[in-house]
Amino acid sequence: MGGMSQSFTDKLAARIKETGSALCVGLDPRPGMDDLEAIPALLRKVVEETAPYAAAFKPNIAYFEAMGLRGLEILEDLLPDMPKDVPVVLDAKRGDIGETQKYYAHAYFERLGVDAVTLSPFMGYDTLEPFLNYEGKGVYLLAVTSNPGSADVERQELAGGRRVFELVGDMVPVSYTHLTLPTILLV
């Protein structure tokens, strides 16, 4: 699918070099705010004030979805106005069957125009393929997360003493050596 002038990893590396920082600024507006219409100005202020230091911005789509259609409109209106040299990682943590993932990938990379997305690989690596068809885009796979519940699955020990998150890390390059266009990273 469409080419781009600078890949996600190149854009991120340039930004880290320019700022001397690996700061990723989360954009997580609370849906319970009394004045929904104050959220766009608040987000723009956060972006403006942190842009000189930010290596990336990371809006969490769940917060926008929780506000309904208006929340998605806020996100869709914000993204084109963000600094073009600062990569945007959409924190979506999606993991679904391929056909559904195809539409998530389209929505995030084509409609919203984000540079990268977070995904859950636990339904199998074939569920990632729709995202991997976008040249130069980034994909962050959840491998071992910081929440206490990560012990329930991600940190479980497998036969042979390895942990689930290690399996995720090992399988990514092996599974996708034929796909060199996007960048796959682990979180």
Name each region found by the language model.
Residues 98-110, 116-176:
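Conserved anion-binding
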Residues 28-32, 62-64, 93-97, 122, ...:
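Active-site beta-loop-alpha junctions enriched in small/polar residues
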Residues 42-46, 74-78, 104, 108, ...:
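A general structural detector for well-ordered alpha-helical segments in enzyme core domains, enriched
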Residues 177-183:
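Conserved small/polar residues in nucleotide/adenosyl-binding loops
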Residues 3-77, 83-84:
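Conserved N-terminal beta1-alpha1 strand-loop-helix module at the mouth
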Residues 76-96:
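Catalytic PLP-binding core of fold-type I/II PLP enzymes
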Residues 23-27, 57-59, 88-90, 118-119, ...:
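Hydrophobic faces of well-ordered beta-strands that scaffold small-molecule active sites
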